[in-house]
């Protein structure tokens, strides 16, 4: 079986159009402009807290929903195969029966979470991002280019 299945997960934006992300290195949460994912001028996202670039900034909610969707899909495939086998052996010498006891996971859409974050306009890229208030005071890295920004003009 070489089929590839694609699942779509909608990630909500807040009132400022920001999407919640989580750094896999320092586990810090931050938000970036939701339009950045379709923008070719931004090649990589930097964590505002540690400044490191990662391949994936998936939050725990998105990961959990993706796992539930893929598990439901896999179990549906298995169930279809066993039901097909049950029908194929219905009138033969060797019979097969299948009763599923699998409970599907509910695939609830991701809800917008409330985080205590402040909007920072990075002058290097002229783009907004939301970071924790402490990072605004201590300084943070621009998520779009990685330049250190201390909040002082």
Where are these regions (language model features)?
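N-terminal alpha-helical interaction blocks
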Residues: 1-11, 67-105
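Short Cys/His-rich Zn2+-coordinating modules
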Residues: 1-12, 24-35, 98-109, 121-129
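Residues immediately within or flanking Cys/His clusters that coordinate Zn2+
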Residues: 17-20, 44, 116-121, 128, ...
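Short cysteine-rich clusters marking metal-coordination/redox-active sites
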Residues: 23-26, 47-50, 122-125, 142-145
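Short, non-ligating residues that shape and space the ligands of small metal-coordination modules
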Residues: 30-33, 55-57, 129-134, 151-152
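Short linker/helix segments within small regulatory modules
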Residues: 35-44, 132-141
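Short metal-binding segments enriched for Cys and/or His
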Residues: 49-68, 75-84, 148-153
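Charged, low-complexity interaction segments
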Residues: 83, 87, 91, 104-119, ...
